[in-house]
């Protein structure tokens, strides 16, 4: 279950928040002002918009991304009930997990202390953790977890005009339609990013191949099955062809290895479209609700199919 849950957000990483205004995904301003200026990757999940969907109930409610795992363990908060929006950021070396919700801060902080986490006062804020990692609350609606030294820098710099999405990353985010409840954007390549993808899966193989991409976006609509769209921009036409052919190769081998008595798997492979347009590779898939389970199993199954 945990591995299946990781698929949807891992796909988003390989390429929040509610689309309330405008045509692109909406990032809650109180979260955006916390994003460091050196951020190269951002991913968002609008939990409120997908809480009642079958995919969330089956998979995303069990998701445990690396930074999210730390946050849940530290605070005891339940993503299924306590969080409304999630944002994950990285500069390629370190990153933050940010969340919006309605928190009983006093009760949570008391629990943190009972769990043995030290209270670290800093510039009017209380950090709970140790000298390596900590979590803090900003008011009763915003929580941030990450490396303790980075949290202190965030506090020092949060009101500076340089904070917020960097221009290149903002431009990428603005291309993601507001009907995508799970989304991500990155600039400057994927090297050094922890994508959280199972290495011994088909998706893990593709993730390894995508290290040469310069920038890209992913958006997933979960309201009626899985509607996935990824736009990947490479450094050269040759890089794009290599990635295009590699993804097509994984799909092709998967089709060839599908038993005759599993026609539903052929349907799944046929939903995946890969197109190269000069330096850009577009990947899309529209999976009907009755095939969601099989789609997740397909891309997380053990063993690597090599093109």
Regions found by a protein language model. Give the residues of each.
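N-terminal export leaders
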Residues: 3-7
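Hydrophobic h-region of N-terminal signal peptides that target proteins for export
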Residues: 11-17
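Structural boundary/hinge residues at secondary-structure and domain interfaces
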Residues: 17-129, 169-204, 243-271, 275, ...
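Short, surface-exposed beta-strand/loop micro-motifs that present aromatic residues
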Residues: 31, 85-88, 131-137, 216-220
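Short, solvent-exposed coil/turn segments at beta-strand boundaries
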Residues: 92-94, 103, 123, 136-143, ...
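A conserved glycine-rich beta-strand in the N-terminal activation segment of trypsin-fold
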Residues: 131, 135-193
């Amino acid at each position: 279950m945990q591995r299946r849950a990781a698929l949807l957000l891992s796909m988003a990483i390989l390429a929040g928040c509610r689309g309330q205004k405008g045509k692109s995904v909406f990032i809650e301003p109180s979260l955006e002002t916390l994003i460091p200026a050196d951020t190269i990757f951002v991913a968002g999940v609008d939990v409120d918009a997908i809480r009642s969907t079958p995919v969330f109930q089956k998979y995303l409610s069990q998701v445990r991304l690396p930074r999210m795992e730390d946050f849940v363990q530290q605070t005891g908060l339940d993503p299924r009930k306590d969080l409304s929006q999630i944002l994950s950021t990285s500069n390629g070396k370190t990153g933050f997990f940010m969340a919006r919700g309605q928190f009983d801060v006093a009760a949570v902080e008391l629990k943190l202390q009972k769990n043995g986490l030290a209270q670290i006062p800093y510039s009017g804020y209380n950090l709970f953790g140790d000298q390596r990692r900590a979590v803090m609350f900003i008011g009763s609606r915003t929580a941030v977890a990450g490396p303790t030294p980075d949290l202190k820098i965030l506090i020092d710099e949060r009101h500076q005009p340089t904070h917020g999405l960097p221009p290149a990353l903002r431009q990428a985010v603005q291309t993601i339609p507001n009907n995508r409840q799970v989304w991500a954007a990155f600039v400057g390549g994927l090297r050094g990013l922890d994508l959280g993808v199972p290495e011994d899966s088909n998706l893990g193989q593709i993730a390894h191949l995508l290290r040469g991409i310069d920038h890209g976006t992913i958006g997933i609509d979960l309201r009626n099955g899985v509607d996935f769209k990824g736009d990947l921009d490479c450094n050269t036409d040759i890089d794009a062809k290599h990635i295009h052919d590699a993804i097509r190769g994984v799909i092709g081998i998967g089709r060839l290895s599908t038993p005759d008595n599993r026609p539903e798997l052929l349907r799944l492979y046929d939903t995946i479209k890969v197109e190269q347009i000069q330096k850009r590779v577009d990947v899309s898939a529209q999976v009907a609700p009755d095939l969601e389970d099989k789609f997740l199993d397909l891309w997380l199954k053990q063993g690597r199919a090599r093109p």
